Regions:
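Juxtacatalytic substrate-recognition/specificity segment
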Residues: 230-378, 385, 389, 395-403, ...
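N-terminal secretory signal peptides that target proteins for export/translocation
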Residues: 1-19
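Structural helix-adjacent loops and short alpha-helical linkers that scaffold large soluble proteins
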Residues: 396-402, 472-488
Length: 637
């Protein structure tokens, strides 16, 4: 990147301000965004179900009052008995995998049989596939759009990491070069000056239209500085200049300075400022537009490229500075699909928040901590943190604090704020809850971002899991947004600690530091009931997401979107129902992805017999303890 001092005239024609009616908010937001001491509740792992060991299988006999929950130990338990009762009853049971190996799957069988039941009085149940059928969207195009968006994001991030494999990251302090002339940023003078409006800056670009990232296959992007603040500089690629006028870039800058930087600095940390200019570059460029084919159902909205943090001796395309690349306004479709002016500018702040979270985490793990690019966070947790950043900015903009258990009316008081920062994460979590047991929550078999809808579900799990973790274990009071000081948890996760831990090990490290169960299997057991028990009457506090009322929000989205997927039901997670009744004799075969759970509900409206549940492999054998299977039970009635 070269920073030149002359200031050309600002091109462009005025554009009419777009007005978006509230009724169209949901359709517009169906395109995804880019890419201390603490006290907490006693986890359910502390409350083990009573066991009975006799001839044959080890049994667990449930003796729970409404609102009670318990956990069956990880190994050896094969039979769960629900005793006979003289009144109505309802139990929610989660069969959970604690495997931490991405891509792993366990095949299980649950037999449910009432005492004295004759064989096959009730037809055997078949576990539903719990995948989203093509017609569940109402419009098949919506499904293709979401899958294409996920696939494009996956392709870029995979290529970006591959491009810097083996490259050395820059360090925060670099020696001044012998020649102080016009050079690229990684050869800048020791004390460069901040940019000024009208300056010309030349960036190197390594991202090709096919989303390949090549450290050597670069071309220059000449841009002009349009707005400068204390922490950000807005620059416009001259290739697409002239569309955004009338103070719109200044408005974007104001939102970044006012809403994004203070929040993300508290939750994630400060950028390293490796180019010493005091700002993060926000580059609106057709480079981003060209990554979307003209006939695509979606579009890339922006990205952060780790190559910009690499030593230029290893990656010639490195700009040696902090840069966020954002979609340029292109109403005439010169570069790809048309991009309305308002679409590019109003969506920019949310995309910038997401990508800035990636950038700060990457710098803390490489530039500042002396790590390599192999220290970058695993995909599932990296995306969970970045999507959480969107929520923090949205809550700040709505003046909401953690722990408020906000419903739809409070969250959507500003439809624009809700649609930009909050709605996308509810949609992702709904995809997860439609089929939690099939979701690759830790990524694919190579710990990468999975393809299509599975990627959205993985991100939904990560966002919801971190939201629950912070709600349960953050230190009370003193938080940046008011309420709990949850930013300490996210700040610790983003950096990875002295050893730059990643993924599950990183979560375990931070959980221990903040009073949560420190072993992944125990943390998952504490989490297991949350997706189905949040805001369920009588459910224990440990099962609650305390900042948002999931049932209220999902019911409202189901109503507002008229059942459009993933909000086809008023609550997306539907347990497999098995009656507590005479004659119950059911067999359910199901699969369980690593670190996920399968949800059952056993219910009677009156007196009921004893029902015995037997959990085995699909071959009818005892489940090996190596599979990390646990059973978590909550009585709700």
């Amino acid at each position: 990147m070269r920073h030149l001092g002359f200031r050309p005239a600002h091109p462009g024609l005025p554009a009419a301000r777009a007005r978006v009616a509230r009724s169209t908010l949901w359709l517009a937001t169906l395109t995804p965004l880019a890419c201390a001491d603490a006290t907490g509740p006693a986890g359910p792992a502390d409350e083990l179900c009573p066991l009975a060991v006799g001839r044959g299988a080890t049994r667990a006999t449930l003796s729970l009052a409404a609102g009670d929950m318990c956990v069956l130990p990880a190994g050896g338990v094969q039979v769960v008995e629900i005793g006979a009762g003289n009144a109505a009853a309802r139990y929610v049971m989660v069969v959970q995998s604690a495997l931490r190996r991405p891509g792993a799957t366990t095949l299980l069988r649950l037999d449910a049989r009432a005492r004295g039941a004759a064989a096959a009085r009730v037809p055997p149940l078949v576990a539903p596939a719990r995948v989203v059928p093509a017609d569940a969207f109402g419009f098949e195009q919506d499904r293709r759009r979401l899958e294409d968006a996920s696939r494009a994001d996956l392709t870029f991030r995979m290529n970006a990491r591959r491009a810097v494999r083996g490259a050395r990251p820059l360090r925060a302090e670099r020696a001044a070069p012998p020649d102080p002339g016009i050079v690229r940023a990684n050869q800048a003078p020791a004390a460069p000056t901040p940019p000024s409006v009208g300056d010309t800056v030349i960036f190197s670009n390594a991202v090709h239209p096919n989303l390949d990232v090549d450290c050597d296959g670069i071309h220059d992007v000449t841009a002009v500085v349009r707005a400068v603040g204390p922490n950000f500089a807005i620059v416009e690629d001259l290739d697409g200049a002239g569309v955004v006028t009338g103070g719109r870039y200044e408005a974007v800058l104001g939102s970044l300075e006012r809403s994004v930087r203070p929040v993300l600095s508290a939750y994630f940390g400060e950028p390293a400022d490796i180019d010493g200019n005091g700002v993060v570059w926000v580059l609106f460029t057709p480079v981003v537009n060209r990554t979307t084919p003209r006939n695509s159902n979606t579009r890339i909205l922006g990205f952060f490229n780790p190559a910009d943090l690499a030593d230029p001796g290893d990656c010639a395309a490195s700009n040696g500075g902090e840069i966020l690349y954002l979609l340029a306004a292109d109403p005439d479709g010169r570069f790809s699909r048309p991009v309305p002016l308002s679409y590019a500018t109003t969506g920019a702040v949310g995309v910038a928040a997401h990508e800035l979270a990636h950038l700060i985490s990457a710098e803390r793990r490489t530039v500042l901590a002396g790590g390599s690019f192999a220290s970058l966070e695993e995909t599932w947790l990296s995306e969970a943190l970045a999507h959480s950043a969107e929520t923090f900015v949205g809550m700040s903009g709505a003046f909401l604090s953690p722990g408020g258990n906000y419903g739809f009316a409070e969250l959507s008081a500003s439809s624009a704020n809700f649609g930009t920062y909050l709605f996308p994460n509810f949609r992702r979590s709904a995809f997860y809850m439609l089929g939690p047991h099939r979701t690759p929550v830790l990524g694919d078999a190579y710990a990468r971002d999975p393809d299509g809808i599975s990627s959205l579900a993985m991100r939904g799990f990560g966002w919801l899991f971190l939201r629950w973790l912070a709600d349960q274990y953050a230190t009370q009071g003193g938080g940046r947004l008011g309420g709990a000081a949850e930013e300490a948890i996210f700040h610790d996760l983003a950096g990875g600690g002295p050893a730059r831990t990643r993924g599950v090990e990183n979560v375990e490290r931070v959980a221990r530091a903040h009073g949560a169960p420190g072993a992944w299997e125990d943390l998952l057991a504490a989490w297991a009931l949350v997706p189905i028990a949040d805001d369920l009457p009588g459910a224990p506090s440990a099962t609650q997401v305390k900042t948002v009322n999931l049932r209220d929000v999902f019911a409202a989205l189901h109503r507002e979107l008229e059942g459009r997927a993933p909000f086809a039901r008023a609550f997306p997670l539907e347990a497999m129902g098995i009656p507590l009744a005479d004659g119950t004799d059911a067999r359910i075969d199901f699969e369980l992805a690593a670190s996920t759970g399968y949800y059952f509900q056993f219910e009677s409206d009156g007196p009921h017999p004893e029902v015995r549940l037997r959990l085995t492999t699909q071959a009818g054998l005892a489940v090996p303890s190596s599979e990390g299977v646990r059973i978590v039970v909550l009585r709700t009635r």
